[in-house]
């Protein structure tokens, strides 16, 4: 570890193989918490390179419990987390709107590491019992178009760094890795990132991996489209900065997207959105993220049509019915 840290301090890059072996050693318990914290800190300060990130991804995928949903060509909708904004569960809400619109969603998530309520927290609040049983998950995909995979059941290696991540309370390379290690290797991905350098990083990674993608960033630092400012979208086909008004949305205020002080409060907001009882700012924020997820799967559709599809899923009750069926199947 000392030699690796020295190289990183000198701004040297690791090869894909070196990065893979480094993370495999961490998952095998070969380093203590102080060493892991030092490693996470130096990567946060100097930044991670494309080949390093792919190497880390390969390490975690080596140790994962795989599951095959390739027949469904699903999408995962996720943010890197760690943006410090403590928003409600926007990506997870968007998943149910997309599934309600008839698409297949394979959501991979975890408990909140730097926020009150991560995806696993809000899903668990509904009485869902996490599983890695392929038969149960396939039934959920078949009957409601939505699967939730709790990261710790599929990526047991992540447990070894959980306490360090919680103690640091800042974004780390594991926030960057989380969206890349969905155990079913989804065909599509909507990924929210907190800054423009991350957009470039992930765009390069997704292009090398051959994944259909949309990477989004609100220019005021949210790791999702928050509508609190202009936002940028990068896909296989285009790179554009949008103003919310260009797509028929109002500008939101940061406090309108607050996720609450407890998982219970976050769950209430989540339910309000899918019951179509939320505030306009909360609803619009979820709809716009769901819309770009739909376009990631159907790139020929203009974004205005994707917004209409997402809105119909919510306002018709299809998104809520998807949630109810999902809870019934997974409780």
Swiss-Prot record:
Keywords: Amino-acid biosynthesis, Aromatic amino acid biosynthesis, Glycosyltransferase, Magnesium, Metal-binding, Transferase, Tryptophan biosynthesis. It is an enzyme of class 2 (transferase). GO terms for biological process: L-tryptophan biosynthetic process. Its cofactor is Mg(2+). Mg(2+) 2 binds at residues 223-224. It catalyses: N-(5-phospho-beta-D-ribosyl)anthranilate + diphosphate = 5-phospho-alpha-D-ribose 1-diphosphate + anthranilate. One of its GO terms (molecular function) is magnesium ion binding. Its EC number is 2.4.2.18. InterPro entries: Anthranilate_Pribosyl_Tfrase, Glycosyl_Trfase_fam3, Glycosyl_Trfase_fam3_N_dom, Glycosyl_Trfase_fam3_N_dom_sf, Nuc_phospho_transferase. Binds 2 magnesium ions per monomer. GO terms for cellular component: cytosol. Anthranilate 2 binds at residue 165. Mg(2+) 1 binds at residues 91, 224. Pathway: Amino-acid biosynthesis; L-tryptophan biosynthesis; L-tryptophan from chorismate: step 2/5. It comes from the Bacteria. Gene3D superfamilies: Nucleoside phosphorylase/phosphoribosyltransferase catalytic domain, Transferase, Pyrimidine Nucleoside Phosphorylase, Chain C. Anthranilate 1 binds at residues 79, 110. 5-phospho-alpha-D-ribose 1-diphosphate binds at residues 79, 82-83, 87, 89-92, 107-115, 119. Homodimer. Catalyzes the transfer of the phosphoribosyl group of 5-phosphorylribose-1-pyrophosphate (PRPP) to anthranilate to yield N-(5'-phosphoribosyl)-anthranilate (PRA). NCBIfam families: trpD. Belongs to the anthranilate phosphoribosyltransferase family. This is Anthranilate phosphoribosyltransferase. The lineage of its organism: Bacteria, Pseudomonadati, Bacteroidota, Bacteroidia, Bacteroidales.
